[in-house]
Amino acid sequence: QLLPELDLIIWILRADERAYAADIAMHQFLLNEGADPSRFLFVLSHADRVFPAEEWNDTEKCPSRQQELSLATVTARVATLFPSSFPVLSVAAPVGWNLPAFVSLMIHALPPQATSAVYSHIRGENRSEQAQKHAQQTFGDAIGKSFDAAVARFSFPAWMLHLLRKARDRIIHLLVTLWDRLF
């Protein structure tokens, strides 16, 4: 019953797995139950364990060239098995590899009313300037839409509408400027 109300479904799959039959069946079940297909975000975890696992670069905390090729193959396969509006992303959470990219993708995938609240709970080391700017922009857009909806409920003379539009822009600018204090 709650599926249609979910802002985003983050589906974690192991990058070092080969069999996704149970995930495919569950994905199809959720779609049949009313989950919005555009709300799925697929993430490959354990990127550091993908073949050849012994080549993971512990110093740089990143995959080797051969592992990058393996991840590209797995990513393409998962994207085919689980169509999504968003790209499939690989991460190695224990070492923090690709987590800022995941956060950025997640923030872009969320509806505008959820971005700031979610972003405020992200650890500093996983934040990116791009994700922060997107959260601030969607916050301003949401305020603008709310303001416009409130003004549209009433009949105002043209001169007052002009003043309200000016006030709207200033209010939005002020709140976006204060965004990091609010969230």
Residue ranges with predicted function:
Residues 83-85, 89-165:
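C-terminal-of-GTPase-core extension/linker across diverse P-loop GTPases
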Residues 38, 47-117:
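Canonical P-loop GTPase G-domain recognition
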Residues 29-33, 77-78:
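A generic secondary-structure signal
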